[in-house]
Amino acid sequence: MPSLCIIALFGTLTFYTLIPSIHTLKCVICDSPMGNYDCKTTYPAATECPGSSNNYCYKRETFASNGNLDQIRRNCNPVAASSKACKDLENGAKICEYSCNTDGCNSVAGMEPTRAVYFIAILMLTFYTFIRL
């Protein structure tokens, strides 16, 4: 009987881990040098993205030709950034774009665990539990 409960628990946790939750993506939205935040070290809390742009959060860094960071923009975006993160412009400047799709992932501390990490942890816990039985 305990193993049946464990299987039911594992199935429920797997379902909630693998099925995307139905909620609006929350991203940090700021634009430097405009506004109250510099968008590099200070930025507002993540807010819900509008329905038309709620697929990805992004961060864009613009560097001058001398290599200095000119602008940081964090926002919501309907499409992911290209696979090549940085591109050089003709005038020697460079633009780097990054996208992600978890709440607040475009913040400075945006390293949030993905669903795969949760799934692996649940799988390991279940495996350990079965071995102990």
Swiss-Prot record:
Disulfide bonds: none annotated. Contains 5 disulfide bonds. Pfam families: UPAR_LY6_2. Expressed by the venom gland. Its main location: secreted. One of its GO terms (cellular component) is extracellular region. It is found in: Secreted. Keywords: Disulfide bond, Secreted, Signal, Toxin. Residues 1-24 form the signal peptide. GO terms for molecular function: toxin activity. The keyword Ribosomal protein does not apply. InterPro entries: Snake_toxin-like_sf. The scoloptoxin-05 family has remarkable similarities with the three-finger toxin family commonly found in snakes. Belongs to the scoloptoxin-05 family. This is U-scoloptoxin(05)-Sa1a. It comes from Scolopendra alternans (Florida Keys giant centipede). The lineage of its organism: Eukaryota, Metazoa, Ecdysozoa, Arthropoda, Myriapoda.
